[in-house]
């Protein structure tokens, strides 16, 4: 959601959300859940659905563009809500118990939240890289002596992002498990794991070998760990030409471990 938004409540109505535009229906839904201050694994589906529909109607009243994606998600929320409100049939021991109807929605929200965090981190790296200023020096003479200051020198952000998306797509093609579980691997642990693997390959480690995992969330956490290492300057990426494989290299800072690492 864009900065500068505000939310007001009136009696017995859903919140009135003022903002220029959401980045998409999942952005709106995530905002409403955060506004409720509830666990993403325990979404109050009836209340959140009513609020989502209210905001979509508000967008229409303000002549804002309501894309098909918003309407599709609104319909899906209504379907999930109806499954909660309908009386549950008498349990039949011969029939396998139906799972939580919110399960797929939670999976999508978790993935969206991780992607959003990754995009924000990439933006911070791009901004910080653009704010570096240098005195006029013999650049050619110094270039061979120092690691480039920009950890993504010669690489477009889109190339790194598209490489990550390709790995996600390959993982989803073979992913069959649909259970929703909290992240088992803390980002701090994954940062150390990724850094150690890069250090073991001083001549460069392929991006596709570094960002790995059997589950989509493991791959996402690995990518977030790489972004953290790029921000800290402990690794840098290189790409010989467009559409070629991206390689990750350790920098001098890579060996600056703390006692806890």
UniProtKB/Swiss-Prot annotation:
It comes from the Bacteria. The keyword Nuclease does not apply. The lineage of its organism: Bacteria, Bacillati, Bacillota, Clostridia, Eubacteriales. It holds the Pfam family SMC_ScpA. This is Segregation and condensation protein A. PANTHER family: SEGREGATION AND CONDENSATION PROTEIN A (PTHR33969:SF2). Component of a cohesin-like complex composed of ScpA, ScpB and the Smc homodimer, in which ScpA and ScpB bind to the head domain of Smc. The presence of the three proteins is required for the association of the complex with DNA. GO terms for cellular component: cytoplasm. Participates in chromosomal partition during cell division. May act via the formation of a condensin-like complex containing Smc and ScpB that pull DNA away from mid-cell into both cell halves. Its main location: cytoplasm. It is found in: Cytoplasm. The keyword Cell division applies. Belongs to the ScpA family. GO terms for biological process: cell division; chromosome segregation; DNA replication.
């Amino acid at each position: 959601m864009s900065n500068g938004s505000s939310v007001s409540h009136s009696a017995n109505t859903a919140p009135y959300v003022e903002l220029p535009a959401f980045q998409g229906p999942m952005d709106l839904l995530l905002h409403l859940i955060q506004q409720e201050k509830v666990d993403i694994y325990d979404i109050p589906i009836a209340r959140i659905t009513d609020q989502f529909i209210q905001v979509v109607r508000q967008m229409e009243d303000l002549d804002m563009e309501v894309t098909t994606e918003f309407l599709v998600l609104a319909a899906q929320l209504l379907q999930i809500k109806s499954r909660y409100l309908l009386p549950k049939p008498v349990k039949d021991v011969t029939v396998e118990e139906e799972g939580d109807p919110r399960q797929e929605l939670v999976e999508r929200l978790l993935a969206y939240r991780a992607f959003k965090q990754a995009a924000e981190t990439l933006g911070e790296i791009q901004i910080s890289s653009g704010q570096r200023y240098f005195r006029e020096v013999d650049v050619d003479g110094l270039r061979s002596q120092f690691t480039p200051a920009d950890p993504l020198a010669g690489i477009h952000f889109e190339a790194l992002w598209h490489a990550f998306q390709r790995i996600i797509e390959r993982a989803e093609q073979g992913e069959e498990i649909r259970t929703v579980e909290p992240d088992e691997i803390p980002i701090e642990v994954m940062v150390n794991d990724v850094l150690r693997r890069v250090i073991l390959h001083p001549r460069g480690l392929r991006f596709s070998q570094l960002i790995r995992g059997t589950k989509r969330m493991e791959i996402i956490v690995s990518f977030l760990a790489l972004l953290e290492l790029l921000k800290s300057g402990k690794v840098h990426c290189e790409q010989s030409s467009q559409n070629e494989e991206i390689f990750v290299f350790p920098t001098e800072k890579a060996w600056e471990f703390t006692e806890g690492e």
